Amino acid sequence: MRSAQVYRWQIPMDAGVVLRDRRLKTRDGLYVCLREGEREGWGEISPLPGFSQETWEEAQSVLLAWVNNWLAGDCELPQMPSVAFGVSCALAELADTLPQAANYRAAPLCNGDPDDLILKLADMPGEKVAKVKVGLYEAVRDGMVVNLLLEAIPDLHLRLDANRAWTPLKGQQFAKYVNPDYRHRIAFLEEPCKTRDDSRAFARETGIAIAWDESLREPDFAFVAEEGVRAVVIKPTLTGSLEKVREQVQAAHALRLTAVISSSIESSLGLTQLARIAAWLTPDTIPGLDTLDLMQAQQVRRWPGSTLPVVEVDALERLL
C-alpha cells in the first residue's frame, strides 16, 4: 500500500546572503515523503533562485502531479531537475539503495573575514581544504585575500568560485596578486570567466587549474580531458535525478577529473542526503556542503555537530 505526504517550508536566511546580485532572505522548498508498507523515503525539492530554471511554485505543481501518478503505480521520473533529484532520493531511500554512510567533512566556506577562516582551519583535522567565493569584490582584493590565506597556512588547498564574474582582464588582475609559488595549491577555480574559451585561456596563462560548474548544465557541454581543467562541480539539485548525478561523476572519473558533490543551499535534510551521496559516489573527495550556517534553522534531520535549532515535521505546512 502506497501513501505520500508533501510539505512546503521556508527558512529565514542570515543577513548578507547574496546570489547573483539578489539578496536571499528566505530559502523556500518542498519535501516529499513516500511510504510503501513499512518503508519510508524522503526527498527535498528546493530550486535555487537565480540558478535553477524552475521556480519552487513550478516545482510544486510538477511534484504534486508526480506524487498522484506514483500513488497510481507510475514510477517514471519527472524531467524538472529539482523535482527529479528530490523524488529520486525519496525512491532510493524507499528501496534502501542510498547508502547510509555519509561524508560530513565539508570544505569550510569563507564568506568574509579571512581571519575567521584561518581560525576555523587551525582546528581542521587531516587535509585542509577550504572554499572562497571570488568575483563579488574587486579582483585585486580577491587576489590579495587568496594569497594571504595560502601564505598563512602552508598546507592549505583552496577551491575558488567566480561564478563567471570576470572578464579576461579581471582574471589577470586577480592572478597578478597570487604568488606563482602558491598557485599549485589552488585546487581549482570554478568558471572564472563569462565564456568557457576565456576560462580556458585564463588557465593556460596563469597556471591556475579551473573547474566546470554552470557549464555542465549547458546543452553543448561534453566531458572531455582538457589542459588546465582539473575538476567538475556537480550540484544535484540543479542536475536532476540520482542516476544523472551518478553518470556525471562516472564521466568525470573516467577522464581522471575530480568530481565534487556540492550544495545548492539545501536544508539540513537535503544536505545530509548530499553527504551520503558524496560518500557513495566520490569517497575520496571532500564535498562542498558548508552552507547550513547561512540559515537560521535545521529541519527534520540534523547535521552532525550543528547547534542550529531544529524544526520538526509537525511544524511544516502540509500540502498533501
Swiss-Prot record:
Q: Which domain of life is it from?
A: Bacteria
Per UniProt, the keywords (alphabetical) are: Lyase, Magnesium, Menaquinone biosynthesis, Metal-binding
Q: What class of enzyme is it?
A: lyase
Please give the biological process terms from Gene Ontology that the record holds: menaquinone biosynthetic process
Q: Which residues bind Mg(2+)?
A: 161, 190, 213
The reaction(s) annotated as catalysed by this protein in its Swiss-Prot or TrEMBL entry are: (1R,6R)-6-hydroxy-2-succinyl-cyclohexa-2,4-diene-1-carboxylate = 2-succinylbenzoate + H2O
| GO molecular function term, any single one | magnesium ion binding
Q: Any transmembrane segments, and where?
A: none
This protein's cofactor list reads: a divalent metal cation
Q: So what EC number does this one have?
A: 4.2.1.113
Pathway(s) the chain acts in? Quinol/quinone metabolism; 1,4-dihydroxy-2-naphthoate biosynthesis; 1,4-dihydroxy-2-naphthoate from chorismate: step 4/7; Quinol/quinone metabolism; menaquinone biosynthesis
Task: State its role.
Answer: Converts 2-succinyl-6-hydroxy-2,4-cyclohexadiene-1-carboxylate (SHCHC) to 2-succinylbenzoate (OSB).
Q: Which family does it belong to?
A: Belongs to the mandelate racemase/muconate lactonizing enzyme family. MenC type 1 subfamily.
Q: Which protein is depicted?
A: o-succinylbenzoate synthase
Source organism (scientific name)? Shigella boydii serotype 18 (strain CDC 3083-94 / BS512)
Source organism phylogeny: Bacteria, Pseudomonadati, Pseudomonadota, Gammaproteobacteria, Enterobacterales
